């Protein structure tokens, strides 16, 4: 049996995002609307927080979460192009992060886990 949305993605979330989402829901926010709004802004962490707290189909949650990563990738690509033009040089790390976001979106749509690479702290 395949893993649920929560089993696949809950471990990616920091408590601060869940706390924010919970507060918004307690104030009467519509969780699905909030998740979609954050997804459109390219903020997958916020979208995920709402998606984990609301009822909805696995497919619907995957779609919104994947869209958040795709939107963030698009915004990153636009920012990289803007910086390329402004500073007359490329910004490959921004483009690399956009590629990772697109791969994450694809994995989410397929119901697979995603890998989040974390930069170790500088000592």
Task: Identify the residue ranges that each predicted region occupies.
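Structural register within alpha-helical repeat arrays
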Residues: 20, 34, 47, 65-68, ...
């Amino acid at each position: 049996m395949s893993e649920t949305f929560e089993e696949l993605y809950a471990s990616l979330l920091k408590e601060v995002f869940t706390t924010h989402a919970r507060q918004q829901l307690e104030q009467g926010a519509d969780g699905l609307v909030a998740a979609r709004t954050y997804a459109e802004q390219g903020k997958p962490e916020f979208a995920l927080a709402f998606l984990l707290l609301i009822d909805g189909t696995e497919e619907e949650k995957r779609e919104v979460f994947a869209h958040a990563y795709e939107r963030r990738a698009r915004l990153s690509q636009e920012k990289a192009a803007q910086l390329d033009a402004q500073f007359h040089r490329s910004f490959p790390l921004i483009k690399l992060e956009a590629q990772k976001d697109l791969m994450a979106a694809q994995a989410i749509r397929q119901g697979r886990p995603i890998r989040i690479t974390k930069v170790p702290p500088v000592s």
